[in-house]
């Protein structure tokens, strides 16, 4: 099943396999791109969710909120990033 990432005025919605993740846009602090598949999340009190298959993919889009970090593994990182930052 392909991953879908959609953003509207109220939330970001990420659907992949059986996961349906909703992140209120008001909680998003930062969105970045990263191509280091072996990068380690910052060590702090945040929870981390890894979304997508890491097999053969080094491109990542990272969504930071106050208490959570969402790491999206994708080959379409520019498309996902553009959707999230529009």
From Swiss-Prot:
Domain of life where this protein originates: Bacteria
Pfam families, per the entry: bPH_8 (PF23491)
Similarity comment: family membership: Belongs to the UPF0457 family.
Designated name of the protein: UPF0457 protein SAOUHSC_02425
Organism: Staphylococcus aureus (strain NCTC 8325 / PS 47)
């Amino acid at each position: 099943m392909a991953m879908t990432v959609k953003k509207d005025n109220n939330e970001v919605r990420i659907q992949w396999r059986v996961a349906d993740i909703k992140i209120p846009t008001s909680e998003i602090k930062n969105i970045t791109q990263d191509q280091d598949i072996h990068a380690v999340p910052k060590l702090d009190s945040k929870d981390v969710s890894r979304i997508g298959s890491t097999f053969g993919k080094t491109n990542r889009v990272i969504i930071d909120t106050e208490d959570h970090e969402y790491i999206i593994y994708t080959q379409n990182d520019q498309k996902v990033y553009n959707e999230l930052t529009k």
